[in-house]
Amino acid sequence: MSLTVSDLTTELKKIIDSKNESALVQLTSQYASKHRDKVVINYKSIYGMYPADAIKKALKSGPAETLLMYAWTDAQEVRARLLNQALSGKNNKSALIDVVLFCGPEDWYEMGAHYTRIFQKVANDTLLSDIGSSEPWSQLIKGWIKHDRYERKAISEDAAALMGYLESGNPDGLIDLLCNTTEGEWKKINKVFTEKYGVEVETLIASNYVKTDMEALLTAHFYLLQPGYAAAYLCSLANSGKKGDSDRMVRITSLMFDKALKCKFAYEKYGKLGSDFKRLYDARLGRALCALWRVDTEGAN
């Protein structure tokens, strides 16, 4: 049963004070960021500190602690801080993909307000000046943050154009389509494309691009189709190799776990999400990831 903001604030304080990490994880898993963000404000007004600071004092350090601190901080403030980290020094391309591409216009504009408040800079201006412009991944990010999408009502024509861009290896045309097409029309374009040409868009992207360019283009494609597809793909990147990327998985989870509930099903093409969490990460983080992504370590997911 969902609690009121007041009752949830009280319950959160009780759990943090008890230093019960398992209970805190379970509570976190039950509420979306729109509810948790209200509690963050209420908690500060009542107890004089933010829940993230209280969590830092109560729990042992480590990626699980960081994840829970992020979860009980305003979601778009977290995005703003992660963006700033990604742009500090050498660009963290993976972080930029996670932070920028898995984001719709409303969240992006709200993030921008936090970014300006915290860093006294304009997020878009900083991003545009800090990343290069010659590589497809950076061109995609620069176009994506405009959030200027419109319906063209030319699905068949766009599908044909998409094939032309993919066959010729023309990143500019592909990026324009990704950045200017609504989610609804992208789904239709993808359907017509697959039916007409007998091949998946993702297959041609993967065969024409590599490394960061491929990861960025596939993330954008999957996000427009279904956020759960994008989250699953990004999780698969973090979970690749003999050891998982804890920093990336914490970042992905904090930004996406309540916005991509289909992730655990979409991940089946890459493996078993719960099993990978348990295998790749320390026990604390593994348990937290399984709870937040709603996967059963004993089951198929």
Curated annotation (Swiss-Prot):
Membrane recorded as keyword: no
Signal sequence segment: none
Localization (cell): Cytoplasm, Cytoskeleton
UniProt-recorded Gene Ontology molecular function terms: calcium ion binding; calcium-dependent phospholipid binding; phosphatidylserine binding
A Pfam entry, by short name: ANXE1_4th
InterPro entries named among the record's database cross-references: Alpha_giardin (IPR008088), Annexin_repeat (IPR018502), Annexin_sf (IPR037104)
Annotated TM spans: none
Lineage: superkingdom: Eukaryota
Repeat region (Annexin), residues: 2-72, 74-146, 153-223, 225-294
A biological process from GO: cytoskeleton organization
Keywords: Annexin, Cytoplasm, Cytoskeleton, Microtubule, Repeat
GO cellular component terms, A-Z: cytoplasm; microtubule; plasma membrane
Family: Belongs to the annexin family. Giardin subunit alpha subfamily.
Protein's job: Giardins are involved in parasite attachment to the intestinal mucosa and in the cytoskeletal disassembly and reassembly that marks the transition from infectious trophozoite to transmissible cyst. They may interact with other cytoskeletal proteins such as microtubules in the microribbons or crossbridges, to maintain the integrity of the ventral disk.
Protein's recorded name: Giardin subunit alpha-9
Species assigned in the record: Giardia intestinalis (Giardia lamblia)
